[in-house]
């Protein structure tokens, strides 16, 4: 098998089952079996004997959805040592069919950060991860208080179906050819209204008008756009594209991980972001990502294109992308 994290299931007499011998992960809006194939470059996301940060669950009231919502907040190892120090913040979004567990469970975002900080490759910053949709009638992983599955398996963001209907229209540059595909994995039925609800302004309101103020009020953040970034994988990248264009006063750096590209025309007439990071796997649509970077740099933008060699629409692509992007964010 290819390196990295993969979902799978077993068919017995035509029926699909999870493997009872492995841990389940949340993907395709349901629990899936998952397997980790060692990668030649896995040291950057391994658990190592270095100082570790903290991932805590927070609940914030959302007036727009009339409910208590959940987010996970990564704070670096230094956060509780110097109680006067303030930090930049990255808002990091999952893909379709996933939930707010995705980036720390499958993505190992906290371990990537811990290792980068220990090696002195980045200045520490906070990461905030929340559920990226407002379709509360069909919420992957259940509501904010959903129980974890039996046997200790953690509900984790997973991949949306590789099969099934895709959203109409051409694939964004950097997304798989043939249409913008949900974060890739095993086949499952798509819920009504799932992908079609992803780019509504409901989540924009939750993120920009409710979660960002909550984080700034309850954590030691540098509460200005130059110290605030938004990025996401697959659908989360598409949300990032939409929200950063709609709310340029909030975010100073943008990251699209297998989630399309920006172009100079749509960015014209506004202050240039500090960083535009665009990535995908070499088995996706790398030509579009590379061209977008060239075009944006020619137009005067600080744009970086990254292609993960030998990977597709999968978590090894996104782990590598976060590793690369984190080293470019919030540079003085």
Residue ranges and their predicted role:
Residues 1-332:
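Non-catalytic cap/lid and distal C-terminal segments of serine-dependent acyl enzymes
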């Amino acid at each position: 098998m290819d390196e990295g994290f993969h979902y799978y299931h077993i068919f017995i007499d035509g029926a699909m089952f999870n493997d009872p011998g492995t841990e389940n992960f949340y993907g395709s809006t349901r629990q899936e079996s998952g397997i980790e194939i060692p990668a030649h470059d896995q040291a950057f996301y391994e658990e190592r004997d270095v100082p570790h940060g903290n991932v805590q669950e927070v609940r914030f009231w959302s007036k727009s959805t009339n409910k208590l919502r959940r987010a996970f907040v990564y704070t670096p190892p230094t956060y509780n040592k110097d109680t006067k120090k303030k930090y930049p913040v990255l808002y990091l979004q999952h893909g379709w069919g996933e939930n707010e567990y995705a980036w720390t469970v499958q993505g190992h975002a906290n371990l990537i950060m811990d290792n980068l900080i220990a090696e002195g490759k980045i200045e520490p910053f906070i990461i905030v991860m929340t559920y990226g949709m407002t379709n509360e009638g069909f919420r992957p992983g259940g509501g904010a208080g959903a129980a974890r599955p039996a046997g200790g398996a953690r509900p984790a963001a997973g991949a949306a179906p590789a099969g099934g209907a895709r959203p109409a229209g051409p694939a964004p540059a950097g997304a798989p050819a043939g249409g913008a595909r949900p974060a890739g994995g095993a086949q499952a039925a798509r819920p009504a209204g799932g992908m079609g609800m992803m780019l509504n302004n409901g989540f924009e309101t939750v993120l920009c008008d409710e979660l960002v103020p909550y984080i700034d009020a309850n954590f030691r953040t540098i509460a200005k756009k130059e110290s605030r970034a938004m990025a996401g994988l697959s659908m989360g990248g598409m949300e990032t594209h939409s929200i950063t264009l709609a709310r340029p006063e909030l975010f100073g750096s943008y990251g699209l991980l297998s989630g399309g590209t920006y172009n100079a025309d749509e960015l014209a007439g506004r202050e240039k972001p500090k960083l535009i990071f665009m990535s995908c796997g070499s088995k996706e649509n790398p030509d579009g990502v590379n061209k977008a970077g060239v075009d944006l740099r020619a137009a005067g933008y600080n744009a970086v294109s990254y292609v993960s060699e030998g990977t597709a629409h999968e978590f090894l692509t996104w782990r590598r992308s976060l590793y690369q992007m984190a080293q470019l964010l919030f540079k003085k």
